[in-house]
Swiss-Prot record:
PANTHER family: PROTEIN ADENYLYLTRANSFERASE SELO, MITOCHONDRIAL. The active site is at D249. ATP binds at G85, G87, R88, K108, D120, G121, R171, R178, D259. GO terms for molecular function: AMPylase activity; ATP binding; magnesium ion binding. Transmembrane segments: none annotated. Its cofactor is Mg(2+); Mn(2+). HAMAP family: YdiU_SelO (MF_00692). The keyword Protein transport does not apply. Residues 462-485 are annotated as: Disordered. Pfam families: SelO. This is Protein nucleotidyltransferase YdiU.
């Protein structure tokens, strides 16, 4: 295992050196063995006979690690801040995985940095456990996401109103390049830095563009980033995920989900669902996430206008043309996603309407999003669920059944295809809170580990799956989330 530091080659405008805080008594709380093996970390620890807690709490540095805090800006709830940066995170470097992909390794909650703006740079155990569970659940669901290698308790208390146990999260991501990273240099008028950053992003995420040059390269880069955002948000909508804080500093160039602070999962289907306590206007509500992704891509495109054409009017026209492709591409991908969830082969507007009508029924009847699609899937092979669905949605179910029959595929085959898009279990909010509370109360990760066994197989019926399928009694109407990590 060898840590590399390619980001440092971009120059010291891109980061500030920062040493992680020394924890008083680091103890491993949660460990991702599969991820550790894929990164070569498990072999390294075995050979060196080392405890992971020291390395992944900031207490010790991995060989060749040169920790830094990354510089970036960002639009937060629509308002621009020209200097944000990692205020409580340290990039340790990069590791090459078993698929030959390179991944960033970062500590969160590892102490103050030059970007902390007066904060303590620390993290409580609750938000750390949430990040581990959510990122692993999302990965198992098939959603592009950062991962969590470890949660380490520090032995120190963190004050968030009350004293809570401190923890450090070790996050692994395809990179930590953000829309806000480009905005940071655009705000300074640093065209050269944007060019270097784009070349670096291409080398990490879009090597197929490496031979492109000039405006063609930058147009291709923007299209590639747009495509990944379309895919990402469609996946969020597929599983019922509400990010909660889709600021441009949380929008990755890689197209991975990052920052699980105020996130949540919808229960009762309603596009206007919002959980974040700081999102009073509902800017980042469930059904508005595609529009926000488009808005964020507009902010990225602005950074590239000087590179798209020397003439500002022509550059703006090119940028607007590129952005104009986003809604259509999203709409196409979204309808295919929805068709996959309902088992319908899209052949016209009537099929799109059939899929949309199902969502409208769920909203009108105040039904659970995940369990309704699960029941619809089972109705093809289980008479009990068939009777239930036919009773719940008589007209729609009759039309849907006729369409499935008309397609000529065996019901078992359709059900199998639907199952790949409709999970049996998701990381429901009330279970998340209960598990976090139990972990903190008992000082033990057992509750999290038990739940993770189910969440890592979300499309299968396990003996313990029913324990986590029930929706909350009030449909999460009173549930709120808060920024934590």
């Amino acid at each position: 295992m060898q840590i590399s530091n390619s980001y440092l080659q971009l120059g010291d405008d891109f980061y500030l050196p920062s040493t992680p805080r020394q924890p008083s008594n680091p103890q491993l709380f949660l460990w991702n063995q599969g991820l550790a093996e894929s990164l070569g970390v498990a072999d390294f620890l075995a050979q060196e006979q080392e405890d992971p807690a020291g390395f992944f709490s900031g207490g010790r540095l991995l060989p060749n690690s040169k920790p830094v805090a990354l510089a970036y800006a960002g639009h937060q709830f629509g308002h621009f801040n020209p200097r944000l940066g990692d205020g409580r995170a340290h990039l340790l470097g990069e590791l090459r995985g078993d698929t030959d992909m390179v991944f960033d390794v970062q500590l969160k909650g590892s102490g103050a940095t030059p970007f902390s703006r007066g904060g303590d740079g620390l993290c409580g155990l609750g938000p750390a456990v949430r990040e581990f569970i959510m990122s692993e659940a999302m990965a198992a669901l098939g959603v592009p996401t950062s991962r969590t290698l470890a949660v380490v308790t520090t032995g120190d208390e963190v004050y968030r109103g009350d004293a809570v146990p401190g923890a450090v999260v070790c996050r692994v991501a395809a990179s930590h390049l953000r829309v806000g990273t480009f905005e940071y240099f655009y705000a300074q008028g640093n065209k050269d830095a944007i060019e270097r950053l784009c070349d670096y992003a291409i080398s990490r995420h879009f090597p197929e563009l490496a031979s492109s040059e000039g405006p063609e390269k930058y147009s291709g880069f923007l299209r590639a980033v747009f495509s990944r955002q379309v895919e990402l948000v469609c996946e969020w909508l597929r599983v019922g995920f509400v990010h909660g804080v889709m600021n441009t500093d949380n929008t990755t160039i890689s197209g991975e989900t990052i920052d699980y602070g105020p996130c949540a999962m919808i229960s009762t289907y309603n596009p206007n669902t919002v959980f974040s306590s700081i999102d009073a206007m509902g800017r980042y509500r469930f059904g508005h996430q595609p529009s926000i992704a488009h808005w964020n891509m507009a902010r990225l495109t602005e950074c590239f206008l000087p590179l798209l054409d020397q003439d500002s009017k022509q550059a703006t026209a090119i940028g607007e043309s590129l952005l104009g492709e986003f809604p259509q591409n999203f709409e196409q991908r979204y309808h295919h996603m929805l068709a996959s969830k309902t088992g319908v082969r899209l052949q016209g507007d009537s099929d799109k309407a059939l899929c949309e009508d199902f969502l409208q029924l769920l909203r009108k009847q105040g039904l659970d999003y995940t369990n309704s699609f699960d029941s619809l899937t089972r109705s093809l092979i289980d008479p009990q669920h068939e009777d239930r669905c036919a009773s719940q949605w008589p007209e729609w179910y009759q039309a849907w059944s006729a369409r499935i029959e008309q397609q000529g595929r065996p019901r078992e085959v359709v059900a199998e295809g639907m199952r790949r898009h409709n999970p049996v279990v998701i990381p429901r909010n009330h279970h998340m809170e209960a598990v976090i509370d139990e972990c903190i109360k008992n000082g033990s990760p057992d509750a999290a580990k038990s739940w993770l066994k189910v969440l890592r197989r979300p499309y299968q019926d396990l003996p313990t799956t029913p324990n986590y399928q029930d929706p909350p009694a009030d449909g999460d109407r009173s549930y709120q989330t808060f920024c934590g990590t």
